[in-house]
């Protein structure tokens, strides 16, 4: 759908949404986002110009439907997919893309580390109508034969350029983790839990050199300018357990990310900030407020956070609790967690469970934040429930398939789609029906009492 839009800007040296926003230009992508968010296109432009909103939309991903990530728009969710060296295939990853989009993912990250990474990424981008993000360090490691010590600047930049050409709309770059942060890491219970962060730590400590993603940040920005790739500044030092939450390492890196965000904005590159992780419920608001302070209100994109470390097998629930609070307090996008977190590679079924948990969290947060129209669907569901409109209830549910499946387990016959009860209470104990009968009887009695008395003749 974007082919013509992109072609009209083909002669421009810098083709980022931020570049146009600064020039006072409302792009077709901005108009599209404004329409689906039900806010003005000028507000979208202003929020992009201020760095508070991004539209990740690589110029080469033309079948992408633009979407906005920022405090002015509804809370978004990301679905992580990707192969490992032990599991999955191209077909399985494409199936995860389809499931992600069906159940409401706003963006998808391809975190593949096994198989033919270029083929997988190409297939994922072609199959997706939502922006695709990547963590380029995985491809870099693949290209240096899994020996991170062989990383060099040319390989690093060539991988970024290749992925930008393929149509990746945002990169997670581990650029805020510095050598000076290592003493803070040494105090932790769990050290570095970011895959990309741990790889960079290995390289930095072996060569006793600064993080190359930090050192060559300006070169990365040039690639982003050319293809309108947004940067998701990665939190290499996110806490991996409650004991490490809100520590020196986490916030030292966050301050660096804030400085790098300013450099990205100066170069007309869109940017968001990644956040934790594992955080006790009572610390989430402080984490959000400090991110706003250190990063000048750049969109905050968090993983969870998980509010307990003992929910193995149910981490999608443990993290959705934290995600809801985080979004309520100002986080712009939530990275989902599946039931397989900490246990294994998620399959399509796990992807569905993770997305639905996070759709609930994001929607609840939007209601709490008072977004215009956020509760309309809930009110429509209440009307459908009270009127026993079962098909409408299924339609309004975040997961219509699951709602219908559970209803039909006990009452599968089509006649029960018109029944004024379900299998929970049956026809005699339904509170809705009892309430309706009470008011019906009361209204009938009132009607009788107000009838004029017949004249005696």
From Swiss-Prot:
Positions bound to Zn(2+): 278, 342
Binding locations of substrate: 80, 109, 138, 174, 194-196, 235-238, 274, 301
Pathway: Cofactor biosynthesis; thiamine diphosphate biosynthesis
Gene3D superfamilies: 6.10.250.620, Radical SAM ThiC family, central domain (3.20.20.540)
Reaction catalysed by this enzyme: 5-amino-1-(5-phospho-beta-D-ribosyl)imidazole + S-adenosyl-L-methionine = 4-amino-2-methyl-5-(phosphooxymethyl)pyrimidine + CO + 5'-deoxyadenosine + formate + L-methionine + 3 H(+)
Key words of the record: 4Fe-4S, Iron, Iron-sulfur, Lyase, Metal-binding, S-adenosyl-L-methionine, Thiamine biosynthesis, Zinc
Residues binding [4Fe-4S] cluster: 422, 425, 430
Comment on bound cofactor: Binds 1 [4Fe-4S] cluster per subunit. The cluster is coordinated with 3 cysteines and an exchangeable S-adenosyl-L-methionine.
GO biological process: thiamine biosynthetic process; thiamine diphosphate biosynthetic process
Protein name stated in the entry: Phosphomethylpyrimidine synthase
Cofactors, names only: [4Fe-4S] cluster
Enzyme class: lyase
Self-association state and partner proteins as the record states: Homodimer.
Family: Belongs to the ThiC family.
Superkingdom of source: Bacteria
Molecular-function annotations in GO: 4 iron, 4 sulfur cluster binding; carbon-carbon lyase activity; zinc ion binding
GO CC terms in record: cytosol
């Amino acid at each position: 759908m974007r082919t013509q839009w992109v072609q009209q800007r083909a002669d421009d040296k810098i083709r980022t949404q931020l570049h146009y926003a600064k020039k006072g230009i409302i792009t077709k992508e901005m108009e599209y986002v404004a329409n689906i968010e039900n806010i003005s296109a000028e507000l979208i432009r202003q929020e992009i110009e201020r760095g508070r909103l991004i539209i990740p939309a690589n110029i080469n991903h033309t079948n992408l439907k633009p979407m906005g990530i920022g405090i002015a728009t509804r809370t978004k969710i990301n679905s992580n997919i990707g192969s490992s060296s032990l599991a999955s295939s191209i077909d399985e990853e494409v199936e995860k893309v389809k499931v992600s989009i069906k159940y409401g993912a706003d963006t998808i990250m391809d975190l593949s580390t096994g198989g033919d990474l270029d083929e997988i990424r190409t297939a994922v981008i072609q199959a997706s109508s939502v922006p695709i993000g990547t963590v380029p360090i995985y491809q870099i490691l693949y290209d240096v034969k899994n020996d991170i010590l062989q990383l060099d600047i040319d390989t690093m930049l060539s991988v970024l350029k290749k992925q930008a050409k393929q149509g990746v709309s945002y990169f997670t770059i581990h650029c805020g983790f510095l050598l000076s942060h290592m003493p803070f890491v040494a105090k932790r219970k769990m050290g570095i839990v970011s895959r990309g962060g741990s790889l960079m730590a290995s390289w930095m400590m072996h060569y006793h050199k600064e993080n190359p993603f930090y050192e060559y940040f300006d070169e990365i920005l040039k690639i982003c300018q050319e293809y309108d790739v947004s940067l998701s500044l990665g939190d290499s030092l996110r806490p991996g357990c409650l004991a490490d939450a809100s520590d020196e390492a986490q916030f030292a890196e966050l301050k660096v990310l804030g400085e790098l965000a300013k450099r990205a904005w100066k170069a007309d590159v869109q940017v968001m900030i990644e956040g934790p992780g594992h955080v006790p419920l009572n610390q989430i608001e402080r984490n959000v407020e400090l991110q706003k302070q250190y990063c000048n209100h750049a969109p905050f994109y968090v993983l969870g956070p998980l509010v307990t470390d003992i929910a193995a097998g149910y981490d999608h629930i443990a993290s959705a609790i934290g995600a809801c609070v985080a979004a309520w307090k100002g986080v712009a996008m939530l990275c989902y967690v599946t039931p397989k977190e900490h246990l294994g590679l998620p399959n399509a079924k796990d992807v569905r469970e993770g997305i639905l948990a996070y759709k609930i969290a994001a929607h609840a947060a939007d209601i709490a934040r008072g977004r215009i129209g956020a509760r309309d669907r809930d009110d429509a569901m209440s009307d459908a429930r009270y009127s026993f409109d079962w098909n409408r209830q299924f339609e309004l549910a975040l997961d219509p398939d699951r709602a219908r499946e559970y209803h039909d387990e006990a009452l599968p016959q089509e006649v029960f789609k018109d029944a004024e009860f379900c299998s929970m209470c049956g026809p005699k104990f339904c509170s809705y029906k009892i309430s309706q009968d009470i008011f019906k009887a009361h209204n009938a009695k009132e009607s009788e009492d107000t009838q004029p008395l017949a004249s005696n003749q």
